């Protein structure tokens, strides 16, 4: 037996993750699934964004939705991970302010009927809030996967997907769980996207 006690710690983390995953509200996730299927079918755009680990998750999932699905189906969602382009991010942060790095991209790219998904542990990041506000003015349907109390984003998103967990890493894990769940569901329903 190791003196570090890692196995016990690891098991406790997995247990906390399992409890949190069972708290995912499936009704709003289903709304997102249906919105993404419609987005795919109608060739509209899908925007994903977040900060830090949430930004990494947005980029990861954009790859899954773009390549992971199209590799097998021959077509995929028109997905944009807004944190992915460091030149655009640093330009906007420098010239417009960090709180506008996502909203400005949406103002330029988004069209009515597009779909946006915010990832935020706290739900209070100013750049996420400005982006959700921009979605309202652009006619973009917004969803937000949120942890902790849900923050201000819970009221700003058209459809919040909130799990009240006070652990940032588990909150970020749930973003990927939901994202991968959606990817597999979209793949299973690919015939409806033609």
Regions found by a protein language model. Name each.
Residues 22-42:
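A short, well-structured juxtamembrane/interface segment
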Residues 38-110:
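Glycine-rich, small/polar surface segments that engage phosphate groups of diverse ligands
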Residues 108, 170-194:
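A charged, well-structured terminal subsegment
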Residues 145-157:
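Short, glycine/polar-rich helix-capping loops at beta-to-alpha or helix-loop-helix junctions
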């Amino acid at each position: 037996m190791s003196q570090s006690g890692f196995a016990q710690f690891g098991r406790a983390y997995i247990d906390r993750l399992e409890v949190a995953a069972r708290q995912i509200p499936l009704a709003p996730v289903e709304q997102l699934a249906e919105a993404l299927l419609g987005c795919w079918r109608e060739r509209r755009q899908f925007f994903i964004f977040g900060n830090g680990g949430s930004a990494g998750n947005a980029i990861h999932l954009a790859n899954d939705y773009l390549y992971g699905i199209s590799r097998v189906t021959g077509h995929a969602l028109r997905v944009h991970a807004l944190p992915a382009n460091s030149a655009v991010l640093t330009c906007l942060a420098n010239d417009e302010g960090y709180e506008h790095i996502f909203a400005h991209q949406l103002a330029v790219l988004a069209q009515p009927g597009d779909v946006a998904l915010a990832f935020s542990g706290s739900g209070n990041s100013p750049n996420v809030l400005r982006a959700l506000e921009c979605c309202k003015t652009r006619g973009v349907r917004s969803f937000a996967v949120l942890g902790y109390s849900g923050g201000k984003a819970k009221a700003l998103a058209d459809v919040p997907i909130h799990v009240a967990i006070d652990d940032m890493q588990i909150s970020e894990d749930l973003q990927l769980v939901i994202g991968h769940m959606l990817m597999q569901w979209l793949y299973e329903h690919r015939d409806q996207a033609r």
